[in-house]
Amino acid sequence: MGRGPSIEARKNASDSKRGKIFTKIIRQIGVAARAGGGDPSNNPSLRVVIDKALASNMSKDVIERAIKKAIGEMEGVQYEEVRYEGYAPGGVAVIVDCLTDNRLRTVSDVRHAFSKCGGNMGTEGSVAFMFKRLGVLSYAHAIADEERITEAAIDAGAEDVMVYTEDDEIEVITTPEAFSRVKEEMAALGLMPYHAQITFRADSDIVVDGDTAIQVRKLLDILEDLDDVQDVYSNVDQVTLGKR
């Protein structure tokens, strides 16, 4: 009987994955700080990324160094935001957000991923119209009842509240501009989300199966694993990919 990966191998794999996550978050911190300054109290975008970093157990020292590099107090690489759009097999729309110091390298890597998996890159705006940019705050029913969360969300200026009884989850939907304010006002009432992000949500999902589902899953996994890629969004039904 074959043996599974050793404890050391599993730890190395976990450390590698954690390192990639940290690298991507540090780039996000840099871009946010350069765009809006290094003070998170006056830079909502930076505040969001710092919260994400802390949730990933990044130390405050690492966060502070990333901010200092971004605002010129320490030497560092300069990154820019780029977005690519395209189609996976089955007509699945895909948005790829990247941070890069070399556009040629990044577009080559992204295009290769699409081609390898039977998809194709599109032009700017070719699929973005199928998505909405939203702030999403996720709460567990255990922290408060549905009525209390809904009332607090509406008072704070949320756009909508979605209740998922089967998943024991309540989602508060905001505009990107109101995201930080709603999150902070609800936190002041003791309502802390277990997950919070500004994301793209598809207007409707596409169901795929068989070999198409395998190729779509492969493409999304390859894209997410690229160093320059920060986020990957698609309108594929996640249940059909076994990701829910």
Curated annotation (Swiss-Prot):
Please provide, alphabetically and separated by semicolons, the GO molecular function terms listed in this UniProt record. Answer: DNA binding
Q: Where in the cell?
A: Cytoplasm
What is one GO biological process annotated to this record?
Answer: regulation of DNA-templated transcription
Among Gene3D superfamilies, the record links this protein to: 1.10.10.200, 3.30.70.980
Keyword check for Transcription = yes
Name the SUPFAM superfamilies on file. YebC-like
Q: Which Pfam families match?
A: TACO1_YebC_N, Transcrip_reg
Q: Cellular component GO terms, alphabetically?
A: cytosol
Q: Which InterPro entries match?
A: Integrase-like_N (IPR017856), TACO1_YebC-like_2nd/3rd_dom (IPR048300), TACO1_YebC_N (IPR049083), Transcrip_reg_TACO1-like (IPR002876), Transcrip_reg_TACO1-like_dom3 (IPR026564), YebC-like (IPR029072)
Does this UniProt record's set of keywords contain Ubl conjugation?
no
Primary site of residence:
cytoplasm
Give the UniProt keywords, A-Z: Cytoplasm, DNA-binding, Transcription, Transcription regulation
Q: Quote the HAMAP family the UniProt record gives.
A: Transcrip_reg_TACO1
Instruction: Indicate the family of this protein.
Output: Belongs to the TACO1 family.
Write the protein's name: Probable transcriptional regulatory protein XF_1906
Organism of origin: Xylella fastidiosa (strain 9a5c)
